[in-house]
Amino acid sequence: MLYQQIASNKRKTVVLLIVFFCLLAAIGAAVGYLVLGSYQFGLVLALIIGVIYAVSMIFQSTNVVMSMNNAREVTEDEAPNYFHIVEDMAMIAQIPMPRVFIVEDDSLNAFATGSKPENAAVAATTGLLAVMNREELEGVIGHEVSHIRNYDIRISTIAVALASAVTLISSIGSRMLFYGGGRRRDDDREDGGNILVLIFSILSLILAPLAASLVQLAISRQREYLADASSVELTRNPQGMISALEKLDRSEPMGHPVDDASAALYINDPTKKEGLKSLFYTHPPIADRIERLRHM
């Protein structure tokens, strides 16, 4: 059951990434058709913008991310138990030892960053280290190490970049169309087929950004499920992960502001969104995550 869930989550992520590229291609073609009169040019331009966005975000420094989240690097002497658990999980996962950081905050949370295992880092709050027992902490660190091993940070970064590219292209296309930069009417002897293409293009401009955001959220949620399952694969202790999630669910929001890009990295929502805002949350509900672990 465990390996079936891991394989299923990986397949779903691949499908969602394909859908993402289709969305990017569709919005590019729509803008190209409406503004430039050439859907081929718009399609190619959109893909180029998407790749540039993704590459620039992937190579963001680990130190920058840690600084944005008020994390400080610690040594084995400063936090031996925490350091050794990270070391153990990395060894079992067969990845290089990540750098180890602590965030001074009473809330219970942790995150990992790095575009590849060789430059990865793990951070945990002081609150989490104080409250979790060893089995629970192994579950949390196993979750973060799994993100590193599965290249989840890179995948999530690509998803954010593609969503940003779709929104940017849609915004530019809408403004150019609104302010008269659209296709010349003397070239538009519209027949039924052209009218359908025009309608599709306008709908793409309107709906693509929302669709891109929803796909990005779906990818992020699938990677969280995968990291939970992969953590159990490393620790062989589903109850430890379940107990950790139960404590995380009762945790207070973090004491310092966390931007949306960083919030997606954490094992638990650092802002504790409620109401309609929770619909656009990057993590699945903790109750659902616990339920999946219980059925392994």
From Swiss-Prot:
CDD domains linked to this entry: M48B_Htpx_like
Needed cofactors: Zn(2+)
Cellular localisation: Cell membrane
Gene3D superfamilies for the chain: Metalloproteases ('zincins'), catalytic domain
Sorted UniProt keywords: Cell membrane, Hydrolase, Membrane, Metal-binding, Metalloprotease, Protease, Transmembrane, Transmembrane helix, Zinc
EC number: 3.4.24.-
Residue numbers annotated as active site: E144
Top-level taxon: Bacteria
Membrane topology of the entry: Multi-pass membrane protein
GO CC annotations on file: plasma membrane
InterPro entries reported for this sequence: HtpX_protease, Pept_M48_protease_HtpX, Peptidase_M48
GO molecular function, one term: metalloendopeptidase activity
Top-level EC class: hydrolase
One Pfam family in the UniProt entry: Peptidase_M48
Residues binding Zn(2+), per UniProt: H143, H147, E224
Details of cofactor binding: Binds 1 zinc ion per subunit.
Membrane-crossing segments per the record: 14-34, 39-59, 158-178, 195-215
GO term, biological process aspect, one: proteolysis
Family note: Belongs to the peptidase M48B family.
NCBIfam families linked: PRK04897.1
Protein name listed in UniProt: Protease HtpX homolog
Gene that this polypeptide is encoded by: htpX
